[in-house]
């Protein structure tokens, strides 16, 4: 893919965000791009290839926001970008003369998405790639929900390589936990715990202790100081998280 891009646009500056998205996991890809893209300069072209439907009739799309461009399959991988942006143009990429000849049905990242991204970065304007569409695939991110007056239920969105359990609970969902001195609560993950402390950093936790911390992704994380909360709690992606406040 990089070779294709550089062959078309030798001056391209290619930055790898990640190659650690879980295989076939469109939501994991959506989470990765949504957390990274806004830190890049205006005009950046983001090539997002998490494409378990490669070779099927799913559409290649070009999404343009106020500051960024995204080239991706139309499978929902840009759903969290749609959630963050207010001015969006989405186009079905149909201009096949920008694709590589003799296209494979198993590697559209190389044969379709990379040459489109390279030509876009080189200066070809978005309308040249295809017409706008409004029926693009978009899924709703899972949101925490109240179970009763004192209990909030969420899930684990992701386990990072350190074993931190990243929940879908944002500060506005649990404002009482945003203070590191918060008391009168307990958190369970998959029924295990309880976790009764919010720390201001990973290093503030005691060795072997599982605790909550507000992470850089903007969500509540369950972590362990120099350890794996995932292993300590036997929990993974999709596990239920319960936050119970004292009555």
Task: State where each predicted segment sits.
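Alpha-helical scaffold segments in soluble metabolic enzymes
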Residues: 3-4, 32-35, 80, 112-119
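Anionic-ligand-binding alpha/beta catalytic cores of soluble enzymes and soluble regulatory domains
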Residues: 100-180
């Amino acid at each position: 893919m990089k070779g294709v891009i550089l062959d078309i646009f030798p001056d391209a500056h290619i930055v790898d965000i990640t190659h650690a998205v879980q295989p076939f996991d469109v939501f994991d890809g959506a989470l990765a791009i949504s957390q990274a893209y806004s830190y890049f300069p205006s005009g950046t072209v983001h090539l997002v290839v998490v494409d378990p439907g490669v070779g099927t009739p799913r559409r290649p799309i070009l999404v343009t926001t106020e500051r960024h461009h995204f080239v991706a399959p139309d499978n929902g991988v840009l759903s969290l970008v749609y959630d963050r942006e207010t001015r969006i143009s989405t186009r079905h990429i149909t201009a096949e003369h920008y694709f590589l000849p003799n296209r494979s049905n198993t590697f559209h990242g190389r044969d379709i998405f990379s040459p489109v991204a390279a030509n876009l970065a080189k200066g070809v304007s978005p309308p040249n790639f295809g017409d706008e569409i409004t029926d693009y695939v978009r899924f709703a991110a899972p949101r925490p929900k109240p179970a009763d007056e004192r209990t909030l239920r969420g899930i684990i969105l992701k386990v990072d390589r350190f074993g931190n359990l990243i929940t879908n609970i944002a500060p506005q969902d649990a404002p009482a936990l945003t203070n590191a001195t918060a008391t009168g609560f307990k958190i369970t993950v998959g029924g295990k715990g309880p976790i009764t402390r919010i720390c201001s950093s990973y290093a503030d936790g005691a060795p072997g202790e599982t605790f909550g911390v507000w992470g850089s992704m903007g969500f509540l994380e369950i972590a362990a100081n120099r350890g794996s909360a995932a292993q300590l709690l036997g929990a993974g992606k999709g596990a239920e998280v319960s936050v119970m406040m004292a009555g």
